[in-house]
């Protein structure tokens, strides 16, 4: 089995990993858009975006654009796969946000259910549950030529699905030849885990605010687990939950079939537009979700009694003026979707792979230090490695 990281050995986002069996069967794991800070470059790859089709499929681990955002550039005859519900959510998200990959997202094929198998030539792939703050994030086990690799996509161990993630992978312990793991936080030090709260910490803090005030909470439109969890807690306490029409469209996709039960959303009030009369009776215990910086600002002025909770990466605060950020009601509670340094070590010790290949990182050398005792591969983008 041959591994080639098309992009991702020395940068965040824009992941793409090619896996080829000895007989020539090939697949690609993720095909993400590069962040603007890295240049926003497309991927030009023979057999994937150019020339004749040379891979049997592209598998997307989760619905973030840095892992799925270039699917519209893939050759039409190369099928793209994603979890069934996650794919529908990504299609809807792409439509409501005007993403260029919206049409391609609507044509994706569904992967089998968790722990089901799908074959691409002589490569067998099994999806496993992950936790990244997007509904149905997945890890992929690829098997060929008597070898096994596990590709994590993005993951964390401080989310709501920690126990389910680890228990699902328990049978793989000690059997994985290569762990291809995200290492976003590898260079940030152990102190990182002390100032990034868990999802449970966030829920506790929001409930404390709701005990005395309404709360306006900024989070990603596709963070269904967070929206569902907080909505359920608010509902149980007799509060109301407000979302915009865009969030409602995504929620409708998540509430279908075997996704989170619709009861989570039974008390939602859905404003088409924000106006002062809609929020005239907002009271303590009510929760307003938004994923729009402009709406966050407008709502904060319309509801002066509300606490303002920002749960995304603090670097995104550059979109807001300093006066807004200095409002005493404003609280940054970023719950990372990425494994803390200690969690990267914990995960490797749990899985016991024979070798580790860090991706989605600007600090692969830090990952090698963090995973002392494990064989960590220092690959470059475009470099082949044979298991």
Where are these regions (language model features)?
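Short, polar loop motifs at secondary-structure junctions
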Residues: 64-66, 85-87, 113, 246-248, ...
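Short, aromatic/basic amphipathic alpha-helical patches
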Residues: 92-100, 232-234, 253-261, 319-327, ...
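Short internal beta-strands
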Residues: 78-88, 180, 240-249, 308-312, ...
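Short connector loops at secondary-structure junctions
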Residues: 32-33, 182-190, 244-256, 334-340
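Short, charged/polar "capping" segments at the starts of alpha-helices
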Residues: 37, 86-91, 225, 248-253, ...
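Hard-cation-handling environments
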Residues: 191-297, 301-302, 309, 359
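C-terminal regulatory/interaction regions
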Residues: 11, 236, 267-387
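His/Asp/Glu-rich metal-coordinating catalytic cores
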Residues: 2-59, 65-212, 216-225, 229, ...
